[in-house]
Design a protein with these regions (language model features):
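Conserved, structured core segments of small domains
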Residues: 1-118
Length: 118
């Protein structure tokens, strides 16, 4: 089954990490990517740029309204997403658990265009 692993983090928290801890987190992620690639479970990763450069688009009175950045109320923003192909939700959650020291991680099954889980 294919899953997406959504990693949310607070940019201020990330910037405040000591360099050694930031390096450790990056190493953990890179090592996990290598492990999942070797096992055939890793499909892709997308790291997202600084959210201050994002635009949020919402329909207001029938007209698209564009605002800078992500939703203002949110402290955590989507930082990256991984696409994986594993045997079960339990395995996807196991992988997500390795990514959580300074982030919130959400796991969702992917669906095809017909709405069937992949």
């Amino acid at each position: 089954m294919k899953y997406v692993v959504l990693i949310y983090s607070n940019p201020a928290t990330w910037r405040a990490l000591p360099a050694e801890e930031a390096d450790r987190v990056i190493t953990v992620h890179n090592d996990l990517i290598d492990e999942l690639t070797a096992s055939g479970e890793f499909l892709s990763i997308y790291r997202l740029a600084d959210p201050t450069n994002a635009r949020t688009v919402a329909l207001r009175d029938g007209v698209p309204a564009v605002t800078d950045g992500p939703f203002g109320e949110s402290k955590e923003v989507l930082a990256s997403l991984w696409e994986i192909d594993v045997e079960s939700m339990e395995r996807a959650v196991e992988i997500a658990g390795a990514l959580t020291p300074h982030a919130t991680v959400e796991v969702r099954a992917l669906m095809d265009a017909a709405g069937m889980e992949m």
